[in-house]
Amino acid sequence: MQTTTTRNHDPARARAYFEDKLAFTTGPVELDRWIKTGQDNLVIVDVRAAEDFAKGHIPGAINVPKEKWDNPQGLNRDKTQVVYCYTQQCHLAANACVRFAGKGYPVMELEGGFETWKENELDVEEAATNRLKGSGEKVGAR
């Protein structure tokens, strides 16, 4: 016996969902544009493990791994925290957004995480060398 599942795709609920999605997520190309145009109302927050952050991260990002979420350093209540983790399937960033928003920080999630950032061939900063991959341009120590 074959069973067919039907979902109710209520237009009002769909609209509310997508309005929220647009308000609380951004994509890698949009974030890259914000970085390159010098938007200073953002804090880019990488919630991956410290060793993964050291191997490469979005330029200008700070690292706040899960064990530091209770007392996060570097966040700013006057700016929007753009939070990312490993991949689209990783829920660390979403969980961090819940935690940080609960502490009064404005948040957005980067869709696709660091994997999608790299797939778009956007610049990657390496902590060990203070170099940007992709542009060949050196960046100063932070």
Where are these regions (language model features)?
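Glycine-rich, highly charged phosphate/nucleotide-binding loops
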Residues: I62-D70
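Short, hinge-like loop/turn segments at secondary-structure boundaries
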Residues: I62, T80, V124-A128
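Catalytic cysteine-centered active loop of the rhodanese-like fold, especially the PTP/DSP P-loop
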Residues: D70, L75-K118
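Terminal peptide-recognition signature
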Residues: L31, D46, A61, F100
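Short active-site oxyanion
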Residues: G38-I44, P59-G60, T80, P106
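Flexible, polar/low-complexity N-terminal or interdomain linker segments that lie immediately upstream
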Residues: M1-V43, A50-D52, E126-R142
